[in-house]
């Protein structure tokens, strides 16, 4: 197993563990009750994974995290409901991978305003699709699943708050150390472009 694969697996396992942790403590529903908005913090590590390793990696580990979360879902739900509720919305993380190449290239070239724009756009779109699937579309298809009203704060406030949190966390990571976003031997950069990372 080469170093790139090892790093990818480690990043994927870290992201999966964080997603499952947030799900296990029931943070989304706790935030709805205590803050009045639904915060999908578990999306942050998956967006990071997509920006770092691409869509396919983000989708695979999102599916793994969702599969583990099936254990934590309501016991009265059938398997179709569990899969649609716990797995399908997390697959939105794959959208972040669309922005991986240009996030890494602009960060490597220190064009930070473009990097930040890519991060914010990825966070916004992933969060939007996740909230639309998990709290609007799936509850319409499966009435047994709790949803959120389109005209209420928990849905829209949660989407915006999740976008802001994800964007701030990922932008801070990019500012603190670009290797937190760009892996060594990144498939999105040439060997010449990654030489500085390899020498760190």
What are the roles of these predicted feature ranges?
Residues 55-60, 111-115:
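Membrane-helix interface segments
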Residues 39-46, 85-93, 165-166:
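Hydrophobic core segments of transmembrane alpha-helices in multi-pass, intramembrane catalytic enzymes
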Residues 1-52, 56-57:
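Hydrophobic transmembrane alpha-helices
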Residues 15-26, 64-75, 123-133:
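Aromatic-anchored segments of alpha-helical transmembrane domains
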Residues 57-64, 84:
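Hydrophobic alpha-helical membrane segments of integral membrane proteins
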Residues 31-36, 78-86, 99-200:
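Membrane-embedded alpha-helical hairpins and interfacial helices in multi-pass inner-membrane proteins
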Residues 20, 47-48, 67-71, 94, ...:
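Alpha-helical transmembrane segments of multipass membrane proteins
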Residues 9-18, 74-99:
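Alpha-helical transmembrane segments and their immediate interhelical/interface regions
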